[in-house]
Amino acid sequence: MNSNFNQHFERIKELRALLNKANYSYYVLDSPEIDDSVYDQLYRELIEIENIHPSLITDDSPSQRLGGVPSKGFKNVEHNIPLLSLDNAFNLNEVEAWYGRISKLISSENKNIKKVYDPELICELKIDGNAISLRYENGILTRATTRGDGKTGEDITTNIRTISTIPLRLLLENPPLWVEIRGEAFMPNNIFNKLNIERKNNDQPLFANPRNSCAGTLRQLDPKIVASRKLDFFAYSLYFPENWEPTDNNFKKPISQSESLEFLKNIGFKVNTTYETTKTLNEANKYYKYWEVKKDFLAYATDGIVVKIDKFEIQNLLGATNKAPRWAIAVKYPAEEKATKLRKIIFQVGRSGAVTPVAEFESIELAGTSVNRATLHNAKRLASLDLHYEDTIIVRKAGEIIPEVIRVIKEFRKVDAKLVQLPQNCPECNSKLILESNEAITKCINYRCAAKLKGLLRHWVSKGSMNIDGLGEKIINQLVNEGYVKSIADLYKLEIDSLLELERFGEKSANNLLIEINESKNKNWHKQLYGLGIPHIGEANAKSLSNNFNSIEELNAIAKESPEKISNIYGFGNEMKDAIVKWFDDSNNQTLIKELKAIGFSLKESLDSNYNSNQSNVFDGKSFVLTGTLDSLTRDEAKELIESAGGKVSSSISKKTDFLVSGEKAGSKLNKAQELGVKIINENELKLLL
């Protein structure tokens, strides 16, 4: 048996070495050494041996990349070396001013230099992702953290293990006791676009940009979701003990940023190879201008360049402020603007009846994507632009994300061009439009408007409300267009014959949808309330209302007789109160309430609720913050309990915080709560209060 174990022990070391080398060749060098089938065979053999001998599983094994069970949350950890941000320059003149300052500073700090010193520079692309710090101990990845505030970040080690371009073990013989690697995690553009297509097909909200998508992915509690999104990583700096010297003759200790990038590549990391060393600022300016034009052809997002002093000796001489190193500066690209021709204005009608003007124009390339439309938001914005049909307009992407029309080139306007004006009638149902008192929002007030109905139905079936997955936008459009559904209540009167007449419906899928629709009648009171689509009432506000009023009848009566009780709810105000009063004043909504109750909706707190009406308001007006790992509850479960009892959960501590619920390994929030005198309780005390 020992002989068998020893054989497996040696074989497992051999397999890991082969697989790690194959990963490095494939993901970092982009030069595969073995076929996929051979890799799969080696990987399966590794898994089989690890299943036989679980004690041989180590953190650096390729089998550990996909992670295990979902995490309950992320703990805060202090950076061993502060992860500073960079000072920004927004034009080349500011870069010249920075260069002049540091040249003089170097000369004044180093007495051996008799004149103003012009240091060698290195220019790198500024990747628009998320800064990550990696700590390796004896060559093995032990911790990965986000930037956070530069001093403290979140431990996301489990998620970082899923990124194939981050080695779990360094390709370095006799590594130092510790190494810290800094770099940028990012989502490649093609992965981002594919993910958004999937989300659109599933009726999920789209991600705004690759940077935000990457940040959200890294904070996923389930590492398998992180692995599925195929994040990437560029390493750009490293720190190691001063007295360490490599024993491998193939490596030499880097003494500059350019050498450190080569070193990083050799020990297993992917680095961005677009960097250049320059002897003059003029060459750095050329690098900036080149990539300002070429950036849209890259496979990842970049929002500028970073200019650094190349030699570590000079970097150490210059040092850093509390926020940023003096030896580097980020140079941002200006927001890209392009001229194009306005083709037409369409007017979209939302579920509240608000009419939004949208400009459609000749297609242009902005920030790497094709753009041919942009929202104009409301009547006031439309008027301020003074748009005429066939105008030449300037379009940019706000924050490199959302297209917006910023101005008109009036010199190119045709003499007989017609002014773009808001329609007098709804573009969907032809009803008379009204202009709200603030003179910004134009609305259709026809309750039976098909566009409003479609929007309301999409809201009703959304995850926060009834969560009817089978009812996507296309099916809703068909149901309304064919006249099968004229109100929310009609969804619950659908028959299988009607569904079978729609596209792509068979008997099984139609039956499944009808079952799903019928089961949604059992949703909680706050979800039913949210689904009604009362303006300004989001999910959190619907929960607050359901905690204060046990039924639609009670809320209806309060709206009519004592509306001030609504505005007195914690987090509410006159705007929400007025919206609720106005909603209940509408006879169409009163009819909807009757219809929903007639088909089986309770529109009230269920009898088996965890708390009765007296208990449910125990935290009314109280603000909570959660920190650390609780004994038996996840953070989401604790948040649900607090909110269901009328409380509000915030992410940050302030003087207005009433309670900090603290668990094991509490972070900096605990210290801040103590400083501010906030009451600190544990999970058991929270349950006692409930």
UniProtKB/Swiss-Prot annotation:
Q: Which GO molecular function, any one, fits this protein according to its record? A: DNA ligase (NAD+) activity
Species of provenance: Prochlorococcus marinus (strain NATL2A)
Could you identify this protein by its name?
Answer: DNA ligase
Cofactor requirements of the protein: Mg(2+); Mn(2+)
Q: Which gene encodes it?
A: ligA
Give residues annotated as binding Zn(2+): C426, C429, C444, C449
> What InterPro entries does the record tag this protein with?
BRCT_dom, BRCT_dom_sf, DisA/LigA_HHH, DNA_ligase, DNA_ligase_CS, DNAligase_adenylation, DNAligase_N, Hlx-hairpin-Hlx_DNA-bd_motif
Q: Which reaction does it catalyse?
A: NAD(+) + (deoxyribonucleotide)n-3'-hydroxyl + 5'-phospho-(deoxyribonucleotide)m = (deoxyribonucleotide)n+m + AMP + beta-nicotinamide D-nucleotide
Residues making up the signal peptide according to the UniProt record:
none
Q: Which UniProt keywords apply?
A: DNA damage, DNA repair, DNA replication, Ligase, Magnesium, Manganese, Metal-binding, NAD, Zinc
